[in-house]
A protein has these predicted regions:
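SAM cofactor-binding core of SAM-dependent methyltransferases
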Residues: 17-135
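Class I SAM-dependent methyltransferase Rossmann-like catalytic core
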Residues: 1-25
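Conserved small/polar residues in nucleotide/adenosyl-binding loops
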Residues: 137-139
Length: 139
Protein backbone atom coordinates (compact mmCIF):
# COMPACT_ATOMS: atom_id res chain seq x y z
CA UNK A 1 0.00 0.00 0.00
CA UNK A 2 2.98 2.26 -0.50
CA UNK A 3 1.07 4.08 -3.22
CA UNK A 4 -1.43 5.44 -0.70
CA UNK A 5 0.44 8.34 0.87
CA UNK A 6 -2.34 10.92 0.49
CA UNK A 7 -4.17 10.12 3.71
CA UNK A 8 -4.55 12.91 6.23
CA UNK A 9 -3.38 15.64 3.86
CA UNK A 10 -5.39 18.83 3.27
CA UNK A 11 -7.23 17.72 0.10
CA UNK A 12 -8.14 14.39 1.70
CA UNK A 13 -9.54 16.11 4.80
CA UNK A 14 -11.64 18.49 2.68
CA UNK A 15 -12.96 15.61 0.57
CA UNK A 16 -13.89 13.61 3.67
CA UNK A 17 -15.55 16.54 5.41
CA UNK A 18 -17.79 17.10 2.39
CA UNK A 19 -18.39 13.38 1.83
CA UNK A 20 -19.58 12.80 5.40
CA UNK A 21 -21.99 15.73 5.32
CA UNK A 22 -23.44 14.66 1.96
CA UNK A 23 -23.89 11.07 3.15
CA UNK A 24 -25.46 12.20 6.41
CA UNK A 25 -28.00 14.33 4.53
CA UNK A 26 -28.72 12.12 1.51
CA UNK A 27 -28.68 8.56 2.95
CA UNK A 28 -28.02 6.69 -0.33
CA UNK A 29 -29.09 3.04 -0.47
CA UNK A 30 -26.02 2.13 -2.52
CA UNK A 31 -22.59 3.65 -2.00
CA UNK A 32 -20.04 3.25 -4.82
CA UNK A 33 -16.40 4.23 -4.65
CA UNK A 34 -14.27 3.70 -7.73
CA UNK A 35 -10.86 4.44 -6.17
CA UNK A 36 -11.46 3.34 -2.62
CA UNK A 37 -7.92 2.99 -1.25
CA UNK A 38 -7.89 1.81 2.37
CA UNK A 39 -10.51 2.05 5.07
CA UNK A 40 -8.09 2.70 7.91
CA UNK A 41 -4.49 3.88 8.18
CA UNK A 42 -2.04 4.01 11.09
CA UNK A 43 -1.02 7.65 11.54
CA UNK A 44 2.51 8.72 10.72
CA UNK A 45 2.45 12.42 11.68
CA UNK A 46 4.08 13.68 8.51
CA UNK A 47 4.41 17.41 7.94
CA UNK A 48 1.61 17.21 5.36
CA UNK A 49 -0.66 15.52 7.91
CA UNK A 50 0.23 18.24 10.42
CA UNK A 51 -1.24 20.78 7.98
CA UNK A 52 -4.11 18.43 7.14
CA UNK A 53 -5.95 16.33 9.69
CA UNK A 54 -4.06 17.54 12.77
CA UNK A 55 -4.69 21.18 11.85
CA UNK A 56 -8.37 20.43 11.22
CA UNK A 57 -8.78 18.70 14.59
CA UNK A 58 -6.98 21.52 16.39
CA UNK A 59 -9.02 24.28 14.74
CA UNK A 60 -12.34 22.46 15.11
CA UNK A 61 -12.25 22.73 18.89
CA UNK A 62 -11.66 26.47 18.90
CA UNK A 63 -14.52 28.59 20.19
CA UNK A 64 -15.50 30.13 16.85
CA UNK A 65 -15.52 26.83 14.91
CA UNK A 66 -18.64 25.18 16.29
CA UNK A 67 -19.74 24.13 12.78
CA UNK A 68 -16.59 22.05 12.33
CA UNK A 69 -16.82 20.60 15.82
CA UNK A 70 -20.45 19.61 15.21
CA UNK A 71 -19.64 17.92 11.89
CA UNK A 72 -20.08 14.17 11.66
CA UNK A 73 -16.58 14.01 10.18
CA UNK A 74 -15.02 15.61 13.26
CA UNK A 75 -16.92 13.30 15.60
CA UNK A 76 -15.88 10.14 13.75
CA UNK A 77 -12.30 11.07 12.86
CA UNK A 78 -11.35 12.63 16.21
CA UNK A 79 -12.42 9.48 18.07
CA UNK A 80 -10.35 7.28 15.74
CA UNK A 81 -7.35 9.62 15.82
CA UNK A 82 -7.21 9.26 19.60
CA UNK A 83 -6.47 5.58 18.93
CA UNK A 84 -3.71 6.48 16.43
CA UNK A 85 -5.67 5.75 13.27
CA UNK A 86 -7.07 7.76 10.38
CA UNK A 87 -10.21 6.64 8.57
CA UNK A 88 -10.31 6.70 4.80
CA UNK A 89 -13.47 7.22 2.78
CA UNK A 90 -14.57 3.54 2.79
CA UNK A 91 -14.63 3.48 6.61
CA UNK A 92 -16.22 6.92 6.82
CA UNK A 93 -19.00 5.84 4.45
CA UNK A 94 -19.60 2.69 6.50
CA UNK A 95 -19.64 4.71 9.73
CA UNK A 96 -22.01 7.40 8.46
CA UNK A 97 -24.41 5.11 6.57
CA UNK A 98 -24.13 1.92 8.59
CA UNK A 99 -27.06 -0.40 8.00
CA UNK A 100 -29.07 2.35 6.28
CA UNK A 101 -27.26 1.47 3.05
CA UNK A 102 -28.14 -1.78 1.32
CA UNK A 103 -24.81 -2.08 -0.48
CA UNK A 104 -21.31 -0.67 -0.45
CA UNK A 105 -19.35 -1.23 -3.67
CA UNK A 106 -15.61 -0.60 -3.45
CA UNK A 107 -13.24 -0.74 -6.43
CA UNK A 108 -9.46 -0.45 -6.33
CA UNK A 109 -6.39 -1.53 -8.29
CA UNK A 110 -4.59 -2.92 -5.23
CA UNK A 111 -5.73 -6.08 -3.51
CA UNK A 112 -4.10 -5.03 -0.24
CA UNK A 113 -6.32 -1.93 -0.10
CA UNK A 114 -9.42 -4.05 -0.66
CA UNK A 115 -8.26 -6.51 2.01
CA UNK A 116 -8.01 -3.54 4.38
CA UNK A 117 -11.58 -2.50 3.50
CA UNK A 118 -12.79 -6.07 4.02
CA UNK A 119 -11.21 -6.23 7.50
CA UNK A 120 -12.84 -2.95 8.46
CA UNK A 121 -16.23 -4.12 7.15
CA UNK A 122 -16.00 -7.23 9.34
CA UNK A 123 -15.08 -5.12 12.35
CA UNK A 124 -18.08 -2.86 11.64
CA UNK A 125 -20.28 -5.96 11.12
CA UNK A 126 -21.18 -4.81 7.61
CA UNK A 127 -19.40 -7.55 5.64
CA UNK A 128 -22.62 -8.85 4.05
CA UNK A 129 -23.32 -5.39 2.59
CA UNK A 130 -19.80 -4.77 1.31
CA UNK A 131 -18.76 -5.88 -2.17
CA UNK A 132 -15.15 -5.56 -3.33
CA UNK A 133 -13.87 -5.39 -6.90
CA UNK A 134 -10.27 -5.51 -8.02
CA UNK A 135 -9.95 -3.20 -11.02
CA UNK A 136 -7.61 -4.20 -13.80
CA UNK A 137 -5.57 -1.64 -15.67
CA UNK A 138 -5.29 -2.05 -19.42
CA UNK A 139 -2.79 0.04 -21.35
Amino acid sequence: MATYTHFGKQPDVLKHLILCEVLRNEHPQVYVETNSACAIYPMQQTSEQQYGIYYFLEKAVEEDNQVLKDSIYYKIESAEMQKGYYLGSPALAMEVLGRQAQKFLFFDIEKSALDNVERYAKQAELQTSVHLYLSLIHI
